[in-house]
């Protein structure tokens, strides 16, 4: 974990997680395969997520899931996980590790993140254990609402631009 930015009541840390993008119907054999490999059952509702100490598992659409590895996996283990999931012909799993991860924590995380997006971060609209796909600083991003923080993801090609926009938001 690398400290990226801080301000009064805000800490933003950049992480280097690994991610697997999954496609499938989410039926019984899908759930069984996923549970066998990562000990999590897939969320049934769109834009919901579940997590444990090792993974965040989110349903991003009716047939797409995102599995984020919170603990560093070896390349061999990532390949094994993807291969085990692809062994089920109803699942298409692919490595999606070209993603940036920023953790927003602190009492003012909503204030600063709101400067970069029009997305409604109020708990009534964006409860804990949900995920949203939205524009942040005009970049297509995902926001994962964990208990006391947000995990914001975007494609690695936007790293410099995203960091510059974060700095701009802090300086406003």
Predicted segments with their positions:
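Basic, glycine/lysine-rich polyanion-binding surfaces/domains
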Residues: 1-172
